[in-house]
Structures are given as C-alpha cells and as structure tokens.
C-alpha cells in the first residue's frame, strides 16, 4: 500500500518532522524514523526491513543531537516577551528542523531549506504559524540581529 509519498527531499523532510514530533512524545529515535518513513509504504513483516534514506536519518539524528543548541538559537530570535515554552510543539519542531538544515546542510541553499520547511509548516500548522516560522528563519538566514537583544 502506498500513497503520494516518495523519496523526494520534500517528502523526507515531512517524514523527519513526523519522526521528530513522535520523539517529543516519547518515541525512540530509530523506531520513530522507521514508523514515519514506512507506515504507509508497506504492511506486515516487510515493515521491519525498510532501509531508511540517509537524508531522513541525518535530519532526525541531527536535530535530536543539536536540540539544545537549536533551541538556544530559536530563543535568541524570538521577540521580547516570548519564550520557547510559549511555542506549540509543532512550531518548535518545524523551527528546529528548518534551522538545522539551514545551519548544517551546506549542500542545501538556505533559501531552499527555508521554503521547504514553510511548505511543511503550511501542511501541519496554520497560516499564522507558517508566517511566524518564515519570519524567524528568514531573520536567521539574513543574519539580522536577534529580536530580543534590542
């Protein structure tokens, strides 16, 4: 059984978001990644033998390993009076994922990573959140001073 998911980078970013969200809910990294990647691709015993794409694993393990650093970067770009705790889990996860790819994936142009995470945000969050994520990540990409440092 398959659906419209392919192994395109956009689809793998979406799968990475799903895995990271599940990890936040207590799932183990590899199990969350395998589930996010394969839940609608195969059924039964075949589900245990799916080989996960390197890009997907790199995103999930990278965000997981750099979570504290990413959260600190996000916090420095929040407007005065806002805190990381005030953000929804969906928005935090999207920000972490987008920021990680922008910061650590040299082969992906910053604007491409930014636009791709906005597309995922539009699917899993609302328009206001997508604009917020766009603004914060655009500020990071442009090297603008942090909003709460003024």
UniProtKB/Swiss-Prot annotation:
This is Transcription antitermination protein NusB. It comes from the Bacteria. The keyword Transcription regulation applies. Disulfide bonds: none annotated. GO terms for biological process: DNA-templated transcription termination; transcription antitermination. One of its GO terms (cellular component) is cytosol. PANTHER family: ANTITERMINATION NUSB DOMAIN-CONTAINING PROTEIN, N UTILIZATION SUBSTANCE PROTEIN B-RELATED. One of its GO terms (molecular function) is RNA binding. It comes from Streptococcus pyogenes serotype M1. Involved in transcription antitermination. Required for transcription of ribosomal RNA (rRNA) genes. Binds specifically to the boxA antiterminator sequence of the ribosomal RNA (rrn) operons. Pfam families: NusB. Keywords: RNA-binding, Transcription, Transcription antitermination, Transcription regulation. InterPro entries: NusB-like_sf (IPR035926), NusB_fam (IPR011605), NusB_RsmB_TIM44 (IPR006027). The keyword Endoplasmic reticulum does not apply. Gene3D superfamilies: NusB-like (1.10.940.10). Belongs to the NusB family.
């Amino acid at each position: 059984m398959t659906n419209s998911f392919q192994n395109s980078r956009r689809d793998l970013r979406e799968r990475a978001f799903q895995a990271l969200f599940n990890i936040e809910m207590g799932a183990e990294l590899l199990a969350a990644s395998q589930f996010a990647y394969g839940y609608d691709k195969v059924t039964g015993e075949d589900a245990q033998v799916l080989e996960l794409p390197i890009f997907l694993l790199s995103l999930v393990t990278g965000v997981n390993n750099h979570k504290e650093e990413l959260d600190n970067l996000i916090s420095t770009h929040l407007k005065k009076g806002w805190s990381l705790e005030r953000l929804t889990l969906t928005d935090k996860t999207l920000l972490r994922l987008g920021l990680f790819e922008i910061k650590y994936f040299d082969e992906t142009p910053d604007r491409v990573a930014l636009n791709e995470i906005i597309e995922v945000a539009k699917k899993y969050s609302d328009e206001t959140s997508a604009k917020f994520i766009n603004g914060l990540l655009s500020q990071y990409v442009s090297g603008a001073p942090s909003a709460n440092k003024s």
